[in-house]
């Protein structure tokens, strides 16, 4: 298994604390904008409730009587006051309750996530994060660290990926709208692309390797 060196950020320090070897297949996948677009659309489609609904001509309330006789009035023929051209008439081809989701193969989703991580690594915006004090952090501590670290840019969005759900870090980051915390099993293409920097907890790298490469 070949690997690449990824910079390590120590939580609390203001510069790189060294580097760590990460599986090359995880962070050097080919750039596939077509798959990134497909998987992002797939994620967003699944979130849609699909509960929007309009009434058609057969569903709106009103009389079924023909408004006036077919011939002899000089007006255009009409068969129902519930037709779409009338006020309070039914809607033609309006939205109906449905599922917007569609299926994407697991291998495609895996390649898209590796492509997104590789994109951030190629940009120099993917780091491994030392995790010894992550669970003890406060919002003020996070804010101070992001502002003082030379490798990170102020005013950008940050995605922190931990090994498993970290309640302490989630509470701290909830007060910072530009920081999002996920865990290895929930890391996804949309959030990697949405955020400018990706910080992987050391233990989360193994979770991602097992999830995406096995």
UniProtKB/Swiss-Prot annotation:
Regions annotated as coiled coil: none
Gene Ontology MF terms in the entry: rRNA binding; structural constituent of ribosome
Alphabetized Pfam families for the sequence: Ribosomal_L4
Entry keywords, A to Z: Ribonucleoprotein, Ribosomal protein, RNA-binding, rRNA-binding
Domain of life the protein comes from: Bacteria
Keyword Transmembrane part of the UniProt annotation: no
GO process terms (BP): translation
GO CC annotation: ribonucleoprotein complex; ribosome
Region Disordered: start-end pairs: 53-79
HAMAP family in the cross-refs: Ribosomal_uL4_B
Function of the molecule: One of the primary rRNA binding proteins, this protein initially binds near the 5'-end of the 23S rRNA. It is important during the early stages of 50S assembly. It makes multiple contacts with different domains of the 23S rRNA in the assembled 50S subunit and ribosome.
UniProt xrefs under NCBIfam families: rplD_bact (TIGR03953)
Similarity remark: Belongs to the universal ribosomal protein uL4 family.
Subunit structure and binding partners: Part of the 50S ribosomal subunit.
Protein's UniProt name: Large ribosomal subunit protein uL4
The organism of origin for this protein: Neorickettsia sennetsu (strain ATCC VR-367 / Miyayama) (Ehrlichia sennetsu)
